[in-house]
Swiss-Prot record:
Family membership: Belongs to the complex I NDUFB4 subunit family.
Keywords: Acetylation, Electron transport, Membrane, Mitochondrion, Mitochondrion inner membrane, Phosphoprotein, Respiratory chain, Transmembrane, Transmembrane helix, Transport
Membrane-spanning ranges: 86-105
Protein's name in the database: NADH dehydrogenase [ubiquinone] 1 beta subcomplex subunit 4
Cellular localization per UniProt: Mitochondrion inner membrane
Name of one Pfam family that matches: NDUF_B4
Keyword Aminoacyl-tRNA synthetase recorded: no
InterPro entries named among the record's database cross-references: NADH_UbQ_OxRdtase_NDUFB4_su
Subunit field text: Complex I is composed of 45 different subunits.
Residues with the N-acetylserine modification: S2
Organism: Bos taurus (Bovine)
Length: 129
């Protein structure tokens, strides 16, 4: 029994399972895929040997996770590029809160001082005059 050749519809694209580029792979690509699979399976086997060890003590450290955590947290400067956006964000988050709290405390102090000078502020628990 022979199947007719698939022809793509005008209203839909060719399904990925019928894409010849998915199956017609060069020998270099197959070799690279096999090497990656061998590395993955070796690392998986090492992890499973450590995980299912009955005399295991402590935590199993995954070197890839340690590298990722180090790159995300402690090693930001090799990946940091100063530009206008980062400079403005640094000023906004570094100096902005200081300016905000200065404004809040200054206006509150000025308001209280004005009420004290007018004699309208109730200072019942004030220790010094």
């Amino acid at each position: 029994m022979s199947f007719p050749k698939y022809e793509a519809s005008r209203l839909s694209s060719l399904p990925t399972t019928l894409d010849p580029a998915e199956y017609d792979i060069s020998s270099e690509t197959r070799k690279a895929q096999a090497e990656r699979l061998a590395i993955r399976s070796r690392l998986k086997r090492e992890y499973q040997l450590q995980y299912y060890d009955p005399s295991r003590r402590g935590v199993i450290e995954d070197p890839a996770l340690v590298r990722w955590t180090y790159a995300r947290s402690a090693n930001i400067y090799p990946n940091f590029r100063p530009n206008t956006k980062t400079s403005l964000l640094g000023a906004l988050f570094g100096i902005g809160p200081l300016v905000f709290w200065y404004y809040v405390f200054k206006t509150d102090r000025d308001r209280k001082e004005k009420l004290i000078q007018e004699g309208k502020l109730d200072r019942t628990f004030n220790i010094s005059y």
